[in-house]
Amino acid sequence: MSRECCRLLPRVFATLLDPRLSGSDDTCLEKLLDCFQFPAMNDLSLKLLQDNPCLTEFLTSVLALPEPSPRILSFTLRLAGILAGSENQFQLLLQEKLLDRLFGQEGLPNSTAWGDATVRSGWVKGVHHMVCHQPALHFLCSTGGIDVIFTLQEDPSLFVASAAHQLLVNMLIFSIEIAAPNPFSTKDLDWPECAQMIIKHIEDSLQSSSASHIKQSLKLLTALFERHNTGWPEVLWLGMAKQIESLLMEKTPEAQPMLVDLLSNMARSPVFYDAEGNFQGLVSSVLEHLTPVQAGPLAVAVLKCCRSPQDVKIKALTVVLQPMDCILRAASQPLEYTGLLDESVSDPTTVESLLSSKSSCVSLLCQTLSHLENLLFQNHLEMYLPYTSLLHSVVTILQFCNGFLTPASPLGSTISRILISSSRVQRSALDVLGKLSEIKACETLTGSVFDVLLAYLESPNTISTVLTKTFQATSMWLLCLQNQSGSNSQQIEKILKAVFLVLQKRLCSPWWEVRDSSLEFLAHLTEHLRDKEEFRKSLLSSEVPRLTENLLEDPESYVRASAVTAVGHLAICNYFAPESPVAGNQHNKENTVAKLEEILSTDPEGFPRRAVISTFTEWLRRGYIGPLEDAEKFVSRVIQTVEHDLDWEVRLGGLKLVKTFFEIFFKKPKADISEPSTIHQDECVQAFCRAKLFSFLFQSLCDCDKPVGQSACHLLLGFRSWLYPFHTLEASQRTGDAPARPSIAWLQSTLRQGSLAQNFPTDGVDFQDPKTMVLALDTINFEELNSELSNSSDYVVKSPLSLIQDILATVGTIEENEVDCY
């Protein structure tokens, strides 16, 4: 700790004891705690407490107050815990009898102040800071502190209860790891003292008649097995297995969700399947006796573990598939029914009852569809999942939701009434439908899939969020259809024609969300299918390109931005790509570029301008702008617009455009193998000077938005590395053009001011002179600039001394520093 910090600390703590400060902002206290958590402040020796007796004096003074403020008491507990986190400082505080009074069972927990949740929260946080060494654990066990933590697990304050729960988990893990770094064997049950007390508490709670005690213990075990599932947790499970099994047999309703969470965490690890304690039997029993809603998470955990036994895996899969099987049965006549399952794990009437209830039907189907989405691409489940029947059931759900299916059973009629227009189920089903497009076995039902997708796209009742999901699923199926080896071109053209007809209507929707999602769908399709002849033919024969161009003038900025992106992809498809039917149409190219440049310079909103600069960068990257001379003029023109833009993301996009232009030179092959590399590099420097890019790059170094400055600095560092692969700053400062040095020194001085260099002047350096720019790149310390730009915005004031001064300034004891360091 610095001398100045030591000098100010007594005044800070004297201020905190002033009763007039009871209403001040708690941020002062948080800042002071931050001070003591700085590595330089929290010295792991006696030095901090010995050099600053005001610390122990403050702790003693607070304990001596007849009615201390709860917030000051909470702060005191946390401060004491931070100090006691060092073993040496812990021993000194123990000798002073301060820890017993603060953290012992007969200390603060036995006082009237304990009734305030702020004090209890501070106590738990203080203990959390303290338990970093074995003596602290022994202290808590011997003074009754651990019993206080057990009690706080059921604190009326959820924050306190949660913190106490997490503290117990950390204490158990820490006590075992420092006492026995090597793995336990099943025969070695000699737990350390702290672990013994926590484990006994768990065992006693599991045998308790109190539902809350049982839930807390199960919650504790769940957190333990979530963080550790090999080694000693196996030993812990052996001692708990029978009690867990008896809880399951008793069918305690309150404990069932926690039991499922516990077993789910254990089921993700293969070690428990091989361990003693009948884990497999317990999992099977839970899968059989609980409803699909309750057992679903456990079933998914079992299925995700590739080493789970086959019989348990099949039961788990049956639990997940049962609701989908019931949907197929509800939609079909008995003789037509081709289900997913040969037999059920639990009573089928249970699932039918859940699907017949308005309160449970939607939640069950959403949960089931979510689980299926997570399981579809698990390689070890490929042989178990009936993909075709699964796809059929998903399509059936979507037909139920929009009323396009006439149910063939009373159950189907009930489900149909519940699901009609259920957007939650529609969105979940469309997510799964899109993923199923990647499964080869599902290709046989392509016609049925597009029937339902087109029905959703055409229906005026499809709300915008569902329409977006429909577009996504349609896009996935169209991409897969185009890549299918035996695809029928006539079928593809028919589907594409229907899609573009619907898209024409959606692009004219009065709802901006619909227009926006339609444009995003078009952009995605065009990006991935522009090389396909059927796609280009269907696109160009529709009104979609014209309508898309019209939306560049949409009143909603989000729509204009999406229209820019879509027009960018359409331009590649229509004008730039060599295989385009209208490739080479110079007038159309120039017209499109001019429209986008106008948006970049005149649109009042940032989103469309960002979209334009992203589109231009993509065109340049793909080589669609033309020869190098054209690209140079294009980049220069765009950057002269971008450098004055008020949106920092547009300016950042401009830097990405410059980087792409630089990469053209970096990747450009030499015309002659004997051509010196310096000629190639000089050509790049000259092009950057002609295009006025250096002015933009150096100006960006002083940008008031840090990401822009950092990006410019990285780009200039990369440029210099390309020019001078073995560059050293010392060598560069000994060479160079002496007459130009004053202007370079001025430039470096300006750059050091960073964003404080207002109205970056351009008359001090000739940014269009190649020699001056080469000298600047060789001389300026970009590493230093990069380091400064990498500092956080508060690095100057976020120091122990500054924090202490800020606290004193806040309470009016000094006036020199009134800056809030946060």
Language model features: what each stretch is:
Residues S2, E234, L263-P334, T338-M383, ...:
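Alpha-solenoid helical-repeat scaffold
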Residues F13, L17, Q37, T60, ...:
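Amphipathic alpha-helical repeat scaffolds
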Residues F103-Q105, F150-D155, I244-E250, E288-H289, ...:
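Eukaryote-specific, cytoplasm-facing alpha-helical/coiled-coil scaffolding segments in long proteins
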Residues K31-D34, F75-I82, G122-H129, D147, ...:
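Residue-level signature of alpha-solenoid helical repeat scaffolds
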Residues M1-D34, F38-F75, L79-S121, H129-I146, ...:
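Elongated alpha-helical scaffolds that mediate protein-protein interactions in large eukaryotic proteins
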Residues L94, L98-R101, L108-T112, L453-F471, ...:
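Eukaryotic alpha-helical scaffold "rod" segments
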Residues I492, R560, P581, P608-R609, ...:
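Domain-wide signal for the mature, well-folded portions of proteins, strongly enriched
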